[in-house]
Swiss-Prot record:
Residues 1-217, 253-299, 326-407, 425-508 are annotated as: Disordered. Coiled coil: none annotated. Residues 326-347 have a biased composition (Polar residues). GO terms for molecular function: transmembrane transporter activity. This is Pheromone-regulated membrane protein 10. Residues 110-121, 170-187, 359-371, 385-396 have a biased composition (Basic and acidic residues). Residues 283-296, 495-506 have a biased composition (Acidic residues). It is found in: Membrane. Keywords: Membrane, Transmembrane, Transmembrane helix. InterPro entries: ThrE-like_N (IPR010619), ThrE/Ser_Exporter (IPR051361), ThrE_2 (IPR024528). It is a multi-pass membrane protein.
């Protein structure tokens, strides 16, 4: 390997370098004054030489958002060449490459190039090579290829986006890696660099690169280039790969917000517009870097056995005494036996009593765990006591599967209190005898206070005796009567000091382990010799030391257990919100989960957001998390989430296994592609047209075609643009109304029905789901979330009405004799005995669009058809009261769904939701309020309108919103009444998973 010469410093021989496998690069000290003089000598010749080198050499340009890191060390070859030859110093300083931030290398990393270095060392010592005189470093042979590739890419893509200019050099990552490898080898005494000199070099290269970039991309072309490169770099200031930019990174893409995902819709297919063309982002990949050549660490699957070994090593570092203990603390694999989900620390604490702890569900009454300080008092239980009317469980079956779980008297201690307890020293040492006059409560640690705090509900009496005096009293009496001297024997003194070193000076052991200590500073008592007669004290001290070590291990495992449980609670919350769990019962689900896992948690739900607070009673603190997501409906994933939720609640699987299953479920793709969903969208529109809106046989294919257009707008266009998703409902209703009125006007409305085509095509974007959730939340006393959803649903309905009015008016301007019928003729309708055949087909379409499995469809069809029969006959008697018919149909649906959940142990939500969606179009069609704006369209196209008619039309334009509210109120009343009949006392263990 080549050795470098310095100013007065001796270098090692090549044989020594080969033996030690590294080179000691000795860097000279750069003279700042000499550097300035060299710059002041610049003449016209040197300026011409500078310009020529700039044109010949390839300048390294960084993007505007990326600045090279300021390194303390300069390039070894550059600085050595500047001191060895004065003739090449001017060229080196003038060369822009020399101003780049320099790097240092570890010889072990470039060991493969040692042969080339040996060959080039002779030449460089004689005359010096071109590369060394210019101060450039050859990283590897692939750099030349990458430079040629960069030049070719810059020529080909210079006019388009210019993404190659924003990519870092491939060798820069290697340099950064090698720079970090040699940080520990640098000695500032051997050779250094002036920091101001290095700072000036960095500033000069950044300014020169920016000026050169500005000259090259000036004018309109440069402006568009800046727009296209806006926010194109990653979180670290540069892109991770050399691929072409996606649509979301270009100027047009940012205007239309391609790939942003859009917001969730409010129709019968919530979340359909949340699909994106891009892959779902991986947070770990974004943090660690997803490029192949970015030098980031590849994220791999978690190996829990390996983590267990690492945790043991970490404990051994912090607590060295734990290495000599009995290795009885083994990791509990995920495929453990049933009943070990909540007591995951039990095998680590006491393996013999693990089975006993699993058999008893009420872990809070276990006094052994309370002694270890793992539990803290449940403040809610202390405040309200046992007189909570909501927790009366006298009429519930505790022995059954859904047995009642009372609010725990104690919950797991928080993370902060456990950390403080882990790093606090015990206060019951002999050093406390010097301050025996102090009150015992003043010397308590947080661990001792927490142990007393576990018995707060029982108000245990306290004593004012000073037990520290009792400890020293008997010893003084023995010494007094036996007249023994305090002089230790020579052979026993060293042994006694070694035995009691940790006990007499507890801070010294913590200093050895480099642990922080939160103990109050107090004077230490002088060392006392141990009486040889008192042999039993040694045994007690050993046992006490072992007990403290076991307590530290328990606390360490307890902290990881608490973090795992809190993470699972947030994951299950996000999954339930994503896949369409009943929003008015989300707080109940989370409360039940935290109660079973013995976590002190409080939950507040807002639309699209859940605020989670984990309390710590010992430190009077709380940790607040906000879980946000775009809510939608995915019936298959909702069923899987419910299965995982029930398995954890009933102690069938552990928390870590449930977390792994949830992660796998979230990453799983949807069952049906967007193109299939568009086809199902059109098929569903065709099926709902005859039985809900009175369409004929000829209206079915027309409605199918128009429904395909609406489905494409929702699943493709709306999912690619955030801006368009805001006006999707208006544009879809305009297109549908325009096409439907044009087709309905053929042959003077004798062939096709305008109202059936228009309402059938818009049936799947009716605000049925969101207004249903709003009414259920209002009825369950969740005023904030219910009011927000209800008001949004009303405005959403007005959007649809405005779009229908505008589309009909546009066609009225084109064709003066357009139809204005809001109802189909009686002779045009399908016979009533055939309408029931379209209901199961529409139910299948609704289930498949919402990603339901095929095995879930039979139950959906039975419940949906039964509910429609009730609605049909109720509509014959209450023709003008849509809320009555909706309430009767929803009551039937709720009874069947809850019975299915209770008898066959299914999930009522997935079985009831398509049946409820069938009730919404039927209620809307009873008054034809969706086409109430057709009169306003006629008013716009005909100028002879009076003030009376305009006032009546203003009231009719709001009729669609009022009809939606009436239908939703009837549905919510029917659902709550059905839940009351089937579950008169509710489900106190898992929560009622129904609408």
């Amino acid at each position: 390997m080549s050795s470098h010469k310095g100013d007065g410093n001796d270098s090692m021989s090549s044989d020594e370098d080969a033996n030690e496998f590294r080179s000691h690069i000795q860097l000279p000290r750069v003279d700042l004054a000499n550097y300035r003089k060299q710059h002041q000598r610049g003449s016209s010749k040197t300026n011409i030489a500078k310009a020529g080198k700039k044109l010949k050499g390839k300048s390294v340009r960084f993007p505007d958002s990326y600045g090279p890191r300021d390194t303390i060390l300069s390039n070894s070859s550059t600085t050595n060449n500047s001191t060895e030859s004065s003739g090449s110093s001017d060229e080196e300083c003038d060369d822009p490459d020399s101003r780049l931030p320099s790097f240092k290398f570890n010889a072990t990393d470039v060991k493969g190039e040692s042969g080339d270095a040996h060959e080039g060392s002779d030449g460089s010592s004689d005359g010096g090579s071109d590369d060394e005189s210019r101060g450039s470093i050859k990283f590897s042979d692939s750099n030349d290829d990458s430079d040629r590739e960069d030049e070719r890419r810059s020529r080909t893509s210079r006019g388009s986006v210019g993404s190659s200019s924003s990519k870092p050099l491939k060798g820069s990552d290697d340099v950064n890696e090698k720079e970090t490898n040699l940080d520990h080898d640098y000695d500032p005494q051997e050779g250094g660099t002036d920091i101001t000199d290095q700072w000036k070099r960095t500033q000069s290269v950044s300014s020169s690169s920016k000026s050169f970039d500005g000259e090259k991309h000036s004018g309109i072309k440069g402006i568009f280039r800046k727009f296209s490169l806006a926010d194109h770099h990653g979180a670290h200031g540069f892109s991770n790969d050399y691929e072409e930019p996606s649509n979301s990174d270009t100027f047009l893409g940012r205007v239309l917000s391609f790939g942003s995902g859009g917001g969730g819709g409010g129709g019968l297919i919530p979340g359909a517009s949340r699909r994106s063309r891009e892959k779902e982002g991986d947070e770990e990949k974004e943090v660690g870097g997803g490029g192949e050549d970015d030098g980031a660490v590849e994220m791999k699957r978690l190996d829990f056995s390996q983590l267990n070994n690492e945790a043991k090593k970490l404990i051994a570092v912090h607590v060295p005494e734990a290495a000599n203990m009995d290795q009885s603390f083994t990791y509990d694999e995920p495929n453990q036996s049933a009943g070990s989900s909540r007591n995951s620390t039990a095998p680590l604490i006491n393996p013999d009593n693990a089975q006993e702890a699993d058999d008893d569900h009420k872990h809070t009454d276990d006094e052994d765990q309370g002694k270890h300080g793992f539990y803290a008092p449940n403040l809610d239980y202390i405040i309200r006591g046992n007189d909570d009317p909501e927790d009366q469980h006298l009429l519930l079956d505790e022995s059954g599967e859904d047995g009642y779980i009372a609010p725990p008297k104690q919950v797991h201690a928080g993370v902060l209190s456990s950390l403080l307890k882990l790093y606090q020293n015990p206060q019951d040492e002999k050093s406390s005898a010097s301050l025996s006059s102090r009150a015992p409560s003043d010397g308590k640690t947080l661990a001792e206070e927490q142990e007393f705090g576990t018995d707060m509900p029982y108000h245990m009496p306290t004593s004012s005796l000073d037990f520290t005096k009792l400890k020293s009293g008997p010893q003084k009496l023995v010494n007094k009567f036996t007249h023994r001297s305090n002089k230790p024997q020579p052979g026993k003194e060293a042994e006694a000091d070694d035995e009691d070193e940790d006990e007499e000076n507890p801070d010294q052991a913590y200093e050895k382990a480099n642990l922080p200590s939160f103990q109050n500073a107090r004077p230490k008592a002088p060392k006392k010799t141990i009486d040889p007669v008192n042999v039993s004290s040694k045994f007690h001290k050993k046992m006490k030391r072992k007990k403290i070590q076991q307590q530290k291990l328990r606390i360490t495992v307890h902290i990881s257990d608490i973090l795992q449980r809190q993470r699972f609670i947030m994951m299950i919350c996000k999954a339930l919100m994503l896949y369409g769990a009943p929003t008015h019962r989300l707080e109940e689900y989370m409360t039940m989960t935290s109660r079973v896992l013995e976590i002190d948690g409080q939950f507040v739900y807002f639309p699209g957001c859940m605020i989670v607070s984990f309390g710590d009673a010992a430190t009077r603190t709380s940790e607040v998390h906000i879980v946000r997501c775009n809510q939608g409906v995915n019936l298959s994933k909702l069923s899987d989430t419910h299965t995982i939720y029930k398995a954890v609640i009933h102690d069938l699987i552990s928390v870590d296994e449930a977390s792994q299953q949830l992660e796998t479920l979230v990453r799983k793709k949807n069952q049906y592609s967007p193109w299939l969903s568009v086809f199902l969208y059109g098929f569903g529109s065709a099926m709902v047209c005859p039985f809900a809106f009175g369409g004929g046989w000829l209206d079915i294919p027309v409605t199918f075609g128009v429904g395909l257009c609406v489905g494409y707008l929702q699943f493709f266009v709306s999912s690619m643009s955030n801006l368009y998703s805001s006006v999707f409902e208006i544009t879809a209703s305009i297109v549908v109304s325009f096409i439907a009125r044009g087709i309905g006007s053929i042959n003077n409305s004798k062939t096709f029905c305008f109202s059936a085509i228009a309402q059938g095509s818009l049936a799947l974007i009716l605000p049925g789901y969101i207004i249903l959730c709003g009414s259920l939340e209002l009825q369950s006393r969740n005023i904030v979330a219910g009011s927000v959803r209800m008001f949004y649903a009303i405005i959403y309905s007005l959007f649809l009405g405005f779009g229908i009015t505008l589309g009909a008016a546009l066609f009225g301007w084109v064709y003066k004799n357009s139809t204005s019928d809001k109802k189909c003729r009686t002779s045009h309708n399908v016979n009533d005995k055939y309408r029931i055949l379209f209901v199961p087909m529409f139910t299948i379409c609704l289930g498949l669009i919402n990603q339901a499995r095929w095995r879930q469809l039979p139950v959906m069809m039975v419940i949906s058809c039964t509910g429609y029969v009730g609605t049909y006959f109720a509509g014959k008697h209450f023709s003008n009261v849509p809320e009555f018919t909706a309430a009767i149909g929803a009551f039937i649906v709720g009874i069947l769904g809850n019975v299915y959940s209770r008898v066959w142990k299914g999930m009522a939500v997935s079985a009831m939701l398509p049946a409820i969606f069938v009730q919404v179009p039927s209620g809307i069609a009873s008054q034809s309020s969706l086409l109430s704006g057709i009169q306003s369209a006629d008013q716009i196209t005909h100028s002879n309108s009076s003030s009376d008619s305009s006032s009546s039309d203003s009231s009719s334009s709001l009729s669609f919103g009022s009809t939606m509210v009436e239908v939703s109120i009837g549905i919510s009343v029917g659902l709550f009444a059905a839940a009351l009949v089937v579950y008169p006392f509710g489900k106190r263990r898992t929560g009622l998973f129904t609408l």
